[in-house]
Curated annotation (Swiss-Prot):
This is THAP domain-containing protein 5. A zinc finger (THAP-type) spans 1-84. The gene is THAP5. It comes from Homo sapiens. Has sequence-specific DNA-binding activity and can function as transcriptional repressor (in vitro). May be a regulator of cell cycle: THAP5 overexpression in human cell lines causes cell cycle arrest at G2/M phase. Residues 348-382 form a coiled coil. Detected in heart. Detected in brain and muscle (at protein level). Highly expressed in the heart. Also found in brain and skeletal muscle. Residues 90-112 have a biased composition (Basic and acidic residues). One of its GO terms (cellular component) is nucleoplasm. GO terms for molecular function: DNA binding; protease binding; zinc ion binding. Interacts with HTRA2; under apoptotic conditions. Interacts with ABRAXAS2.
Length: 395
């Protein structure tokens, strides 16, 4: 059963947080009632009755009340604990209360931006983006044709007022110049683009968008958007391409927009769909699909590279561990190594035969000497001792 301190505001326990400092635990003086009363008074627990399994740690005693002998701290017989912290002092230090206060503050912080975003959404819900066109009106009769494009919904509270100036450049001088009136309405969930023009067989439209004060500070440069509409032979089909050129000369081509328009007169009118993305809007479906393709391609290339790296690592390990399994070595070189090994084996066999012959000759000599009584047991022991001492000195 682990020991722990019985004081109210003390969390010391044996085996925990005792690496930097030494803690010792002392039992209550149950047999000395006067001393026990002093302990309980200092602890502010007069009515409490401790048991023999409860202890106080050394943090509650002064150094004078401890007797150190052979590195062990013993409690003196007259020692009384005097160092105690009241629960009122530790109310501010309670971690559970601190955590609850932090949670309350976080909840308040979360509620405040939500309320602010709702208020800004209500205020900005009726704002619109207005487009002004500077085109000379020479012909009062206009044929209206409209096309609706739904851009992705921007985030709440980020609706902005942008001003667009359009300048038309007519290629066919024989026909009257066309007039273009556009209006952009952007809400949080809907987006529309309405165009009214005539005689746009082959025109180039240049849109210069100047950012207003409410636009994000990161988009400080102006952007030029060029839309080219080329009318085909088929009266019910137009091919439109749109390109954005930023001030940093980093153009990127939007997806080609193909639209089929019913009951369209080739000589008088054509339809163009212009998609103007908001700054904080979400990416379109085509860009999302292309991004997914890019990510999958990158993942495939990473997997292939990792596989190639694993194969290279495996070949390196094989080349290091098994010197005869290298792919760089030719067969001729391997056969040369095999022949060298065979020659070494034959040399070892010859040496073995020579040593065996010498041993047999020595055994024959010893037998002959024993038969002729040239060697007695004493002489044999002397010779054996001589050989053993010689071997020891050699070792």
């Amino acid at each position: 059963m682990p020991r722990y301190c019985a004081a109210i505001c003390c969390k010391n326990r044996r085996g925990r947080n005792n690496k930097d400092r030494k803690l010792s635990f002392y039992p209550f003086p149950l047999h000395d009632k006067e001393r026990l009363e002093k302990w309980l008074k200092n602890m502010k627990r007069d009515s409490w009755v401790p048991s023999k399994y409860q202890f106080l740690c050394s943090d509650h005693f002064t150094p004078d009340s401890l007797d150190i002998r052979w590195g062990i701290r013993y409690l003196k017989q007259t020692a009384v604990p005097t160092i105690f912290s009241l629960p009122e002092d530790n109310q501010g230090k309670d971690p559970s209360k601190k955590k609850s206060q932090k949670k309350n503050l976080e909840d308040e912080k979360e509620v405040c931006p939500k309320a602010k975003s709702e208020e800004s959404f209500v205020l900005n819900e009726t704002k619109k983006n207005i487009v002004n066109t500077d085109v000379p009106h020479q012909h009062p009769e206009l044929l209206h044709s409209s096309s609706l494009v739904k851009p992705p919904a921007p985030k709440t509270g980020s609706i902005q007022n942008n001003m667009l100036t359009l300048n038309l450049v007519k290629q066919h001088t024989g026909k009257p110049e066309s007039t273009l009136e556009t209006s952009v309405n952007q809400d949080t969930g809907r987006g529309g683009f309405h165009t009214c023009f005539e005689n746009l067989n082959s025109t180039t439209i240049t849109l210069t968008t100047s950012n207003s004060e409410s636009i994000h500070q990161s988009l400080e440069t102006q952007e030029v958007l060029e839309v080219t509409t080329s009318h085909l032979a088929n009266p019910n089909f137009t091919s439109n391409s749109m390109e954005i050129k930023s001030a940093q000369e980093n153009p990127f081509l939007f997806s080609t927009i193909n639209q089929t328009v019913e009951e369209l007169n080739t000589n008088k009118e054509s339809v163009i769909a212009i998609f103007v993305p908001a700054e904080n809007s979400k990416p379109s479906v085509n860009s999302f699909i292309s991004a997914q393709k890019e990510t999958t391609e990158m993942e495939d290339t990473d997997i292939e590279d990792s596989l190639y790296k694993d194969v290279d690592y495996g070949t390196e390990v094989l080349q290091i561990e098994h010197s005869y399994c290298r792919q760089d070595i030719n067969k001729e070189h391997l056969w040369q190594k095999v022949s060298k090994l065979h020659s070494k084996i034959t040399l070892l066999e010859l040496k073995e035969q020579q040593t065996l012959g010498r041993l047999k000759s020595l055994e024959a000599l010893i037998r002959q000497l024993k038969q002729e009584n040239w060697l007695s047991e004493e002489n044999v022991k002397i010779i054996e001792n001589h050989f053993t001492t010689y071997e020891v000195t050699m070792i």
